[in-house]
């Protein structure tokens, strides 16, 4: 995954969030994982060719991750989860002019001693 400055920073900032429909964020194999397991977060939007970004709300002041799409979706892979990877995630996408989508619903990821089921659930704020 590629790290980028937070969108409120001066360089490379997103100018117009909310111009495109919000994407869907899902977790595979599920939102409840054990340390050391692999996790894929999929961000999917309706528009092809956009750049996708994943944000962990607990790390807003640090950065977010960028991915080039596979058609209209991007996968953010965590090879070996750690306890500190648990948290509230959301995603968005944007075009080459830094015009962005609405933010996805928040997806809560747990990293515990037990593993959960498929796909995850979004938390509506």
Where are these regions (language model features)?
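N-terminal "mature ectodomain cap" immediately after the signal peptide
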Residues: 20-49, 54-56, 64-67
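A generic structural signal for short beta-strands and their flanking turns/coil linkers
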Residues: 21, 72-74, 105
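Intrinsically disordered, low-complexity regions enriched in proline, serine, glycine
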Residues: 36, 51-55, 63-65, 87, ...
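Structural signature of extracellular immunoglobulin-like
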Residues: 38-47, 52-60, 78-80, 85-96, ...
């Amino acid at each position: 995954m590629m790290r980028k400055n937070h969108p409120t920073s001066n360089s490379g900032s997103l100018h117009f969030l909310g111009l495109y429909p919000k994407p869907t964020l899902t977790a595979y194999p599920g939102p409840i994982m054990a340390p050391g397991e692999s996790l894929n977060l999929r961000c999917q939007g309706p528009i092809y060719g956009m750049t996708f970004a994943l944000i962990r709300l607990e790390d807003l002041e640090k950065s977010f991750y960028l991915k080039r799409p596979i058609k209209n979706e991007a996968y953010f892979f965590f090879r070996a989860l750690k306890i500190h990877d648990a948290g509230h995630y959301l995603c968005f996408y944007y075009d080459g002019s830094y015009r962005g989508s609405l933010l996805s619903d928040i997806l809560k990821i747990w990293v515990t001693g037990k593993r959960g089921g498929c796909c995850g659930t979004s938390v509506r704020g």
